[in-house]
């Protein structure tokens, strides 16, 4: 009598194969979802950091320079033209001290001229377009010409707009003090935060310090409790985005600094 072959090969049923395939598919989908989520979070984090860092650096630079201002900040439009009221506005301009204090005397060789000097052996020479402030004579005027009196000199003859240097008359052996200021500005235009280093001598020259700015009118003068402009402060609202990762739907990552009220240093000048 022949016995049956008990060692014959066995296989999976169709139902078992389908269940195993489904399990593998579910695991693969879960792993893909986790990896994709991680990549999205990484991309978003990088985008946020880039946008935040650029806007933060821009605001810190604006705040630093406003802290150095010696004139009441003035609101301007994107073409650096003055605007009325408390804003908001695209830009702001103000004066900072760039050199001085200097002694001011009438030139001994030409009394009709004035001479500014310092005991500093290596002073920074004022430049045409800088603003000269002589508080004792209420003189605030732009420098139109400057000549050094000798090579390596630490004193110069200075000529002011409208002949204002002729208003300064000092007695022999006496002097008055002057400061040299420069009007600078920050303007948002075409999504760029632009820095203007000298609005008198080179009004069209600027450098871009932040990009992708989404707040076109970030500057204003805050109101005090009575509802009038508080000119002691400048309010800055700056926001930015980084569109690099827009394909992952994180284009609108941004930073917004609302009402960062920045006080200026002092009011040395009476005029803008």
Feature roles, as predicted:
Residues 50, 98, 180-183, 190-272:
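Short linear sequence signals and composition-biased patches located at protein termini or domain-edge surfaces
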Residues 10-67, 271:
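Aliphatic-rich helix starts adjacent to a transmembrane/signal segment
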Residues 8, 74-76, 224:
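Acidic surface patches and DE-rich sequence motifs
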Residues 46, 55-211, 215, 271-272:
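N-terminal pilin/flagellin-like segments and related low-complexity appendage regions
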């Amino acid at each position: 009598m022949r016995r049956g072959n008990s060692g014959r090969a066995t296989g999976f049923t169709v139902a078992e194969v389908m269940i195993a395939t489904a399990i593998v598919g579910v695991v693969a989908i879960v792993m893909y979802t986790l990896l994709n989520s991680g990549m999205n979070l990484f991309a978003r984090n990088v985008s946020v950091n880039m946008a935040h860092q650029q806007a933060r650096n821009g605001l810190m630079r604006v705040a630093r320079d406003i802290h150095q201002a010696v004139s009441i900040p003035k609101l301007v439009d994107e073409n650096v033209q003055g605007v009325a009221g408390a804003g908001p506005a695209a830009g702001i301009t103000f004066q900072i001290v760039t050199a001085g204090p200097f002694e001011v005397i009438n030139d001994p060789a030409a009394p009709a001229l004035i001479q500014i000097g310092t005991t500093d052996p290596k002073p920074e020479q004022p430049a045409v377009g800088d603003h000269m402030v002589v508080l004792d004579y209420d003189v605030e005027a732009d420098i139109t010409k400057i000549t050094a009196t000798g090579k390596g000199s630490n004193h110069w003859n200075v000529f002011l707009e409208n002949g204002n240097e002729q208003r300064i008359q000092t007695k022999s052996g006496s002097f008055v003090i002057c400061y040299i200021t420069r009007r600078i500005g920050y303007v948002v235009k075409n999504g760029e935060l632009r820095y203007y280093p000298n609005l008198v001598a080179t009004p069209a020259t600027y450098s871009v310090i932040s990009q992708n700015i989404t707040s076109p009118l970030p500057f204003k003068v805050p109101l005090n409790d009575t509802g009038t402009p508080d000119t002691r402060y400048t309010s800055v609202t700056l926001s930015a985005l980084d569109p690099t990762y827009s394909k992952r739907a994180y284009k609108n990552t941004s930073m917004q600094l609302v009402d960062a009220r920045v006080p200026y240093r002092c009011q040395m000048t009476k005029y803008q």
